[in-house]
Curated annotation (Swiss-Prot):
GO terms for cellular component: ribonucleoprotein complex; ribosome. Gene3D superfamilies: Ribosomal protein L10e/L16 (3.90.1170.10). Keywords: Ribonucleoprotein, Ribosomal protein. The lineage of its organism: Archaea, Methanobacteriati, Thermoplasmatota, Thermoplasmata, Thermoplasmatales. One of its GO terms (biological process) is translation. It comes from Thermoplasma acidophilum (strain ATCC 25905 / DSM 1728 / JCM 9062 / NBRC 15155 / AMRC-C165). GO terms for molecular function: structural constituent of ribosome. The keyword Nuclease does not apply. This is Large ribosomal subunit protein uL16. CDD domains: Ribosomal_L16_L10e. PANTHER family: 60S RIBOSOMAL PROTEIN L10. It comes from the Archaea.
Amino acid sequence: MVTKPARMYSRITGPAYTRKEFMGGVPYPKITTFVQGNQKKDFPIEMRLVAEEPCQIRHTALEAARVSVNRRMTEAAGLDYFYLKVVPYPHHVLREHKMATGAGADRISSGMRAAFGRPVGTAARVYPDDVIMIARTDEAHAKELKTALRKAAIKLPTPCKVVITKGKEIAGSLGI
């Protein structure tokens, strides 16, 4: 089945739909790794990707953003010189009411009768000033990390900003 455009699910409407025990079956989220890189090292610079508007981020968009940052930082710095954590978990279940189209569809379908929909995916609900990603690195790779987070923000359905939470004086001296 074709994946619907993310704009169909990006607005927050109604209460969260998370009780999986009442559903027939929910597809697993595509994002499975939430923490990457060197978790033991204490890095001097920490940056966060912060949402500016309320939205729902599909599990595929979270995975695309994670892969984007991971690939860029692995090529630039290597796995030992950065840390990445994806904060929101896609708990909210997205539903879709499948509609038959084409010749003779009116005889087969029941229209809007019993139009509750079947689970098709999951999403994370994010509100303004919620942290989406936390990333840490050293001085040598700080500019690359900021660029990687900015490119990851493009893959998400909400405008985001990169906030430096640790090492502002170091980042200021580097011109970030």
